[in-house]
A protein has these predicted regions:
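A structural signal for multi-pass alpha-helical bundles of membrane permease subunits
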Residues: 17-304
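Short, Lys/Arg-rich, polar N-terminal cytosolic tail immediately upstream
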Residues: 1-16
Length: 304
């Protein structure tokens, strides 16, 4: 009888041991379920309603989604998003990588540390301050036009954010030279984790720095590329603060992006049902692009 009781007690402890790790993360899942999953599901449901954010809520089926096809502002915003997304990915995977390669090749430790801190310091500056600084740079009486006038290029002086021909390009050029930030640190840490033995072996074969970049560094940084591309895609779909402060989507809709259009529909026109439909479409597009990125960007090991 004692043996049976002892066996039962051990069985209970064994079951508890198996579920114990899940109990520790249960509060996190409850919080995510309450504040993330519930709100996401609720927004998807409300996308089928004509809803003002209050009590007025009328089921209209797919009408909000059908309205997107005739929404010229949404169409323009998607075109702008495509351009911004492509240029953002190019900016993220090129210049920060080049700067990380440069720092890795600096032989003086003090000089390398100086460059690291120089690229990191701008991260602590509030983004609103940086946005307003660039708004002044692009102003008709701002720094950019002042430099152009100084070097004799007055014919290029224009209202960069107020001209439909230059507004989108100015938004893309915002925060030039796109070096400082987490992208630089991610590439730098990835390069530092590549075993020295790999470099020593290829140096004996007389490989050039350019060959080293394309045949060793870039393949072994596939994980970093994948992470940065995913975060860039998500940021491009969700971010609109700098556009709101720089141009507010104008002139016209030349710099409008879907996230800002969603914001306007929600808090300017109180068309919450349509805004939920916009959010649902953006969520599905972001998920699809992230899935493609995760599936086709393979992370090799250093041994390969």
């Amino acid at each position: 009888m004692r043996k049976i009781q002892k066996h039962t007690g051990n069985g209970r402890r064994s079951v508890f041991t198996k579920i114990e790790p899940y109990l520790y993360i249960l509060p996190l899942f409850l919080l995510l379920g309450t504040f993330k999953m519930y709100s996401t599901v609720y927004a998807i449901v409300k996308s089928f309603y004509q809803w003002d954010g209050g009590r007025i809520s009328v089921f209209i089926g797919m009408q909000n989604y059908i309205a997107m096809f005739s929404d010229k502002v949404f169409g323009q915003s998607m075109m702008n998003l495509g351009i911004i997304l492509i240029t953002s990915i190019l900016k993220v995977v090129t210049i920060p990588l080049i700067m990380a390669e440069f720092v890795m090749r600096v032989k003086s430790k003090k000089a390398a540390d100086f460059y690291k801190y120089a690229f990191i310091v701008p991260m602590v500056i509030p983004s609103v301050v940086i946005i307003m600084l660039w708004r002044w740079i692009y102003d008709y009486n701002g720094l950019l036009n002042g430099i152009l006038s100084m070097i004799g290029l007055e014919r290029f002086v224009t209202s960069w954010l107020g001209d439909a021909k230059t507004a989108l390009g100015a938004v893309i050029g915002y925060n030039f030279p796109w070096v400082a930030g987490i992208q630089f640190l991610i590439f730098l840490s990835g390069l530092q984790n590549i075993p020295d033995g790999i470099y020593e072996s290829v140096e004996l074969e007389g490989i050039t720095p350019l060959q080293r970049l394309f045949y060793i560094d870039i393949p072994l940084l596939a994980g970093q590329f994948r992470y940065l591309i995913i975060t860039t895609v998500v940021t491009a779909f969700q971010s609109f603060e700098h556009i709101l402060l720089l141009t507010n989507g104008g002139p016209g809709a030349t710099t409008m992006v879907p996230a800002l259009h969603l914001y306007n529909q929600s808090f300017s026109y109180f068309n919450m049902g349509y805004a939920c439909a916009l959010g649902t479409v953006l969520f599905l597009m972001t998920s699809f692009i992230s899935y493609i990125n995760m599936k086709y960007i393979r992370t090799p090991s250093a041994s390969e």
